[in-house]
C-alpha cells in the first residue's frame, strides 16, 4: 500500500482530533507512567496524551514511515516506532493503551482486543475510538462504485458491534464503558467530502488504480455523493460520521 499523506490527513485536524479529546476525557486515570498511542499518525493524539501526563513515558506506534516522521518532528520528546500494531511488544506493562481511529483497519478483533488487554498493567486502561461508518453513504458508495467499475473489494471490514466488543472485553477481565456518537461535520462542498475520505477510507480503493482509473472512480463517486448528501439552506452539507468509543479497564 502507498504511504499515508500526513498533510492531507491533517487538513481536517480539528475534526479528527475532537473524538480523541472526548475519548481521553473518559479515561479514569490520574497518574500513568507508561502509555502507548497505537496508530499515532502525525502525533495529534500523542500531543493530547503528553499534555495530560507530561511526565509519562509515551510511545507512539504507526506502520506509516511518513506519519512516524511527522510525529517525531512535532513531538521530539516522545518515542515513535514504525511497527505493526499486531506485532509490537512493549518493554513493560502499559498503564494506558490509547487507540484513536486505528484499530478499525486491523482484522480479527476477537483476538486483537484480548491481546491488547494482556499488555496492560493491573487496573490499566484500553481506550479505543473507531469510525463506525461502514453503512454510511460515504462508504457504501465506495463499494458501489467499485462494483460498477469492476474493481475488487478493498475496503475494511465492518466493526464487530457494541455487544460483541462488550463481551470480548468483559471476558478478558475488564470493566467496559462503551458508547456511540454521531458527529455532523459541516462540509462546504461534495468535493470536501472526497478530500476527507481520500486521506483515510478511500485510500485502499484508489491505491492500485492508474491515474485515469482514479479520476473515473472519483467522478462517479462525486456524482453519487451529490445524490445522497443534499445541500442545506446555507449551501453547506452535513456529513454524518458515527464513531464507536470503548474504555475498558482491567479489574486486576
Curated annotation (Swiss-Prot):
It is found in: Cytoplasm. Its EC number is 2.1.1.144. It catalyses: trans-aconitate + S-adenosyl-L-methionine = (E)-3-(methoxycarbonyl)pent-2-enedioate + S-adenosyl-L-homocysteine. Keywords: Cytoplasm, Methyltransferase, S-adenosyl-L-methionine, Transferase. It holds the Pfam family Methyltransf_25. Its main location: cytoplasm. GO terms for biological process: methylation. The keyword Coiled coil does not apply. One of its GO terms (cellular component) is cytoplasm. It is an enzyme of class 2 (transferase). GO terms for molecular function: trans-aconitate 2-methyltransferase activity. It comes from the Bacteria. Catalyzes the S-adenosylmethionine monomethyl esterification of trans-aconitate. PANTHER family: TRANS-ACONITATE 2-METHYLTRANSFERASE, TRANS-ACONITATE 2-METHYLTRANSFERASE-RELATED. Belongs to the methyltransferase superfamily. Tam family. This is Trans-aconitate 2-methyltransferase.
Amino acid at each position: 500500500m502507498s504511504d499515508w499523506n500526513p498533510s492531507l490527513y491533517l487538513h481536517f485536524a480539528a475534526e479528527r482530533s475532537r473524538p480523541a479529546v472526548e475519548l481521553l476525557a473518559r479515561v479514569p486515570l490520574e497518574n500513568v507512567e507508561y502509555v502507548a498511542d497505537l496508530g499515532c499518525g502525525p502525533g495529534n493524539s500523542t500531543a493530547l496524551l503528553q499534555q495530560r501526563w507530561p511526565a509519562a513515558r509515551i510511545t507512539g506506534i504507526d506502520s506509516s514511515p511518513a506519519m512516524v516522521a511527522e510525529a517525531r518532528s512535532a513531538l521530539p520528546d516522545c518515542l515513535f516506532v514504525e511497527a505493526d500494531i499486531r506485532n509490537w511488544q512493549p518493554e513493560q506493562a502499559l498503564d494506558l493503551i490509547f487507540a484513536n481511529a486505528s484499530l478499525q483497519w486491523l482484522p480479527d478483533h476477537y483476538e486483537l482486543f484480548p491481546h491488547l488487554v494482556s499488555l496492560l498493567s493491573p487496573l490499566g486502561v484500553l481506550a479505543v475510538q473507531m469510525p463506525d461508518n461502514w453503512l454510511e453513504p460515504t462508504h457504501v458508495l465506495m463499494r458501489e462504485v467499485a462494483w460498477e467499475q469492476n474493481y475488487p473489494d478493498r475496503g475494511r471490514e465492518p466493526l464487530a458491534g457494541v455487544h460483541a466488543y462488550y463481551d470480548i472485553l468483559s471476558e478478558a477481565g475488564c470493566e467496559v464503558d462503551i458508547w456511540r456518537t454521531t458527529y455532523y461535520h459541516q462540509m462546504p462542498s461534495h468535493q470536501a467530502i472526497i478530500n476527507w475520505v481520500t486521506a483515510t477510507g478511500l485510500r485502499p480503493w484508489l491505491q492500485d488504480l492508474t491515474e485515469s482509473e482514479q479520476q473515473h472512480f472519483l467522478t462517479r463517486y462525486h456524482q453519487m455523493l451529490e445524490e445522497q448528501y443534499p445541500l442545506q439552506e446555507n449551501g453547506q452539507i452535513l456529513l454524518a460520521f458515527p464513531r464507536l468509543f470503548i474504555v475498558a479497564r482491567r479489574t486486576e
